[in-house]
Amino acid sequence: MLAATCNKIGSPSPSPSSLSDSSSSFGKGFHPWKRSSSSSSGSCNVVGSSLSSFGVSGASRNGGSSSAAAAAAAAAAAAAALVSDSFSCGGSPGSSAFSLTSSSAAAAAAAAAAAASSSPFANDYSVFQAPGVSGGSGGGGGGGGGGSGAHSQDSSHQPVFISKVHTSVDGLQGIYPRVGMAHPYESWFKPSHPGLGAAADVGSAGASSWWDVGAGWIDVQNPNGAAALPGSLHPAAGGLQTSLHSPLGGYNSDYSGLSHSAFSSGASSHLLSPAGQHLMDGFKPVLPGSYPDSAPSPLAGAGSSMLSAGPAAQLGGSPRSSARRYSGRATCDCPNCQEAERLGPAGASLRRKGLHSCHIPGCGKVYGKTSHLKAHLRWHTGERPFVCNWLFCGKRFTRSDELQRHLRTHTGEKRFACPVCNKRFMRSDHLSKHVKTHSGGGGSAGSGGGKKGSDTDSEHSAAGSPPCHSPELLQPPEPGHRNGLE
């Protein structure tokens, strides 16, 4: 605080030479320290007492020995003399306020030597060191710094309190010695070991700090970058660098040839080889008999690589459903389709017919669509996938039109109306029976109309669709025939 105040007071002076040599330029401005002698002596006494108390408090830290107390008293006396000589209370106005006399400098040097010999912390925390005296100008401040000659020469021109900031941190090792056990992150905290003698050399040589791990640890192309570290560093630093390099270097070595060989034809050829054919088992090739109207496929040749001997044997032993899984057509297991696929190109005539026969022995029914054949096969197997979702019903049906017909019993919908009397019915066969009563003995016509109505019900069984009737029922009967019925 005192050093900062003195620096602020001495800064507005014109020049150091004018302060020490000429009194005319020194007395032009306003200077707060040039007051009455009583106030000047009071301020000097206050500063001296504060410095003496500071010296005593610093001496009390040394353990309370008699030699330390004597050294502290000498330092306090030297400081009082220094302050009294520096501020020159009642002196001639021509003398500089901050010029240090040779006697005060010698006294301060003696006090510093006594304090250095008695205090174990004098090398690091001694306040009163030998000041660096500037010849003629009187502008040099008291030097703090370390106890060695090199440190005192380097820091002689620094203030007392600021000089400790720039000193080496290695001096603190005498106060707080490190534990002998090595820390796992020792090389991160400090690059040098506290026990090595070259610690100060490494720190002064401009080595990287503890947060500078080095630019090489990111460089994955140089996994041996730890060899560039100084030899005086802790051995754990080399291990850390190696551990940092090893994961990235390992990945670099493992995948070094990936960009060159993974996408080349030589490296990917094993995917298409017979040994690696299992990778493409889920994607079956399109069989030549899949499309009935297509020409014979060139893949069916003996020299084709896709249909080699190995895959052909696998396809022959696998079920037809898996072989035709990705053929683009609905799977059909009827005897006609199996025969057409077995014949290959020779079975094109069977495929053009589009006939799907029931394979159950003794049935022999034939359908033109695979969906109709599947619906027929449910009669044989007893499968009923269509369930009524009406409340407390849950009935199951084989065909969707049967389910739609059943739902009309719940809703009460009557889709079919009589064209003569406009009477409505839920089912088309009921309407056909009713129309027979209007036709009067037209058994053949009535039976034909009933069959057509039943087919209409089966084909157009979607709910909400408009009622469909046969053309005969849509035509109004002749008046004479109706009169005869009446």
Curated annotation (Swiss-Prot):
The keyword Zinc applies. Residues 16-25, 36-46, 294-305 have a biased composition (Low complexity). Residues 1-46, 136-157, 294-324, 432-486 are annotated as: Disordered. InterPro entries: Znf_C2H2_sf, Znf_C2H2_type. GO terms for biological process: dorsal/ventral pattern formation; embryonic limb morphogenesis; proximal/distal pattern formation. It comes from the Eukaryota. GO terms for cellular component: nucleus. Pfam families: zf-C2H2 (PF00096). A motif (9aaTAD) lies at residues 208-216. One of its GO terms (molecular function) is zinc ion binding. It is found in: Nucleus. Keywords: DNA-binding, Metal-binding, Nucleus, Repeat, Transcription, Transcription regulation, Zinc, Zinc-finger. Transcription factor which plays a key role in limb development. Positively regulates FGF8 expression in the apical ectodermal ridge (AER) and contributes to limb outgrowth in embryos. PANTHER family: KRUEPPEL-LIKE TRANSCRIPTION FACTOR, TRANSCRIPTION FACTOR SP8. The 9aaTAD motif is a transactivation domain present in a large number of yeast and animal transcription factors. This is Transcription factor Sp8. The lineage of its organism: Eukaryota, Metazoa, Chordata, Craniata, Vertebrata. The gene is Sp8.
